[in-house]
Amino acid sequence: MTELDKRHRSSIYDSMVKSPNRAMLRATGMTDKDFETSIVGVISTWAENTPCNIHLHDFGKLAKEGVKSAGAWPVQFGTITVADGIAMGTPGMRFSLTSRDIIADSIEAAMSGHNVDAFVAIGGCDKNMPGSMIAIANMDIPAIFAYGGTIAPGNLDGKDIDLVSVFEGIGKWNHGDMTAEDVKRLECNACPGPGGCGGMYTANTMATAIEVLGMSLPGSSSHPAESADKKEDIEAAGRAVVKMLELGLKPSDILTREAFEDAITVTMALGGSTNATLHLLAIAHAANVDLSLEDFNTIQERVPHLADLKPSGQYVFQDLYEVGGVPAVMKYLLANGFLHGDRITCTGKTVAENLADFADLTPGQKVIMPLENPKRADGPLIILNGNLAPDGAVAKVSGVKVRRHVGPAKVFDSEEDAIQAVLTDEIVDGDVVVVRFVGPKGGPGMPEMLSLSSMIVGKGQGDKVALLTDGRFSGGTYGLVVGHIAPEAQDGGPIAYLRTGDIVTVDQDTKEISMAVSEEELEKRKAETTLPPLYSRGVLGKYAYIVSSASRGAVTDFWNMDKSGKK
């Protein structure tokens, strides 16, 4: 590959008529020699509002050093983030999923608007990862994602705790099992420093999935935020993206159908977040890879759940790092025929070649169960179907002993109303709590229900009360929960016509989600019901009008699809 080939976009500045453009670039420090090299963007979601992202500006500088040491010119950019843990349970949560697509669009705009030849995207909070990957897939120029790393566990009275411990503490306080002072002690010790939330929650799930896809460096997803390994992998990402340029390696070479199958496989084995379904569908859509909810069920049936990680297990993500990390898990799964070892990754090597350099899981470790004695014989993420969710719904059943729940619905049109019912003991064992009109269009923004689900668990009703919604759940959620119900209420899905007292069935063995309401009664209720108008102001108004169903990834660019489904 020639130097000009490596400058496949920035060479636009070479001509005489681009002298004014170069004048601007010289003010940023570029010299004649720099104009002869590739321009590589380094864009992060740095912000001071959350531990997930507070360190990312410094990480951007490390990535720049890597780019420069590889002979290219680095340029640092910033984009937005919305911190789920801070927005949770507030009106701000409507902006969380919305931010995923804003991040994707802003990265594409900044990188394309400045004609960079390649880029490194650095993220820390939940929507940063899929947002970055949607942009990477859409642009299809050499690019790597670098994760800011997982937070260290907090410690209280010799016991590891995390943010979810505080959410559940509210339920325990309401139930009389904790004092306000107990909760304050949790609050003050749960988050000891920078990094993404520490269990197998959404941030760590998506960072892992991206590593498995082959779009971040091997081992990087499980390096803790404050570790020396993390600083090294961030700098290495800068060097690696220049190597991708030299190889002519693009995301479309890496993001294959087999790559997504492997990402789902590892997500199942580690007990990842329900949000993985939404985000992997969206990334696949951007990459023009055919992926559907049914693919998750197909893989779920053959892949056991091996990881004893929070929220349903006892270990945090840093514990996985200490026994070999994601590469050791992948190596174990590859050796047992679960992964495609021959596909290419961002290193220019295959999955199998990358993993050959890593050690096996530490002998005697207890974070990852053996295939002969898994935590669960099949995967913990299940796609449900039935007359309550004709287009599907997503359940996470890790740690759930109840395989079938049948009970009366208690229907709420907002999370706030449902929370009030829980706090005032209106929800009794056997109930099915339903929160609707909180889907992608109805929210708008499909907010997560961690505040609500954690209160139910904290009150000791996690296995006794089912929680259903057309919204989402945090990766920190566990219990009898079903989200992403589609079609959503705002689109006139059956959940819009469910009434308090209707009997609802959730069965993880038959993968059923149904309501005991006849077609005739349902049609009668439709005729009697007027759906609320779409939200129509600002960014949420735009989002509500263009976002797709959750069953298709809640993406925002479906209007230009041809019959093949390609963009």
UniProtKB/Swiss-Prot annotation:
UniProt binding sites for Mg(2+): 84, 126-127, 448
GO biological process assignments: isoleucine biosynthetic process; L-valine biosynthetic process
Cofactor note: Binds 1 [2Fe-2S] cluster per subunit. This cluster acts as a Lewis acid cofactor.
Catalytic activity: (2R)-2,3-dihydroxy-3-methylbutanoate = 3-methyl-2-oxobutanoate + H2O; (2R,3R)-2,3-dihydroxy-3-methylpentanoate = (S)-3-methyl-2-oxopentanoate + H2O
Ranges that cross the membrane: none
Alphabetized UniProt keyword annotations: 2Fe-2S, Amino-acid biosynthesis, Branched-chain amino acid biosynthesis, Iron, Iron-sulfur, Lyase, Magnesium, Metal-binding
Residues that coordinate or bind [2Fe-2S] cluster: 52, 125, 197
Listed pathway(s): Amino-acid biosynthesis; L-isoleucine biosynthesis; L-isoleucine from 2-oxobutanoate: step 3/4; Amino-acid biosynthesis; L-valine biosynthesis; L-valine from pyruvate: step 3/4
Cofactor: [2Fe-2S] cluster; Mg(2+)
EC number per UniProt: 4.2.1.9
Pfam family, one: ILV_EDD_C
Group of enzyme by EC: lyase
Entry annotated with the keyword Electron transport: no
Entries under Gene3D superfamilies matching the protein: IlvD/EDD C-terminal domain-like (3.50.30.80)
Domain of life: Bacteria
Single GO MF descriptor: dihydroxy-acid dehydratase activity
Entry-annotated residues carrying N6-carboxylysine: 127
Subunit (UniProt): Homodimer.
Function: Functions in the biosynthesis of branched-chain amino acids. Catalyzes the dehydration of (2R,3R)-2,3-dihydroxy-3-methylpentanoate (2,3-dihydroxy-3-methylvalerate) into 2-oxo-3-methylpentanoate (2-oxo-3-methylvalerate) and of (2R)-2,3-dihydroxy-3-methylbutanoate (2,3-dihydroxyisovalerate) into 2-oxo-3-methylbutanoate (2-oxoisovalerate), the penultimate precursor to L-isoleucine and L-valine, respectively.
Family the entry assigns: Belongs to the IlvD/Edd family.
UniProt protein name: Dihydroxy-acid dehydratase
Highest classification ranks of the organism: Bacteria, Bacillati, Bacillota, Bacilli, Lactobacillales
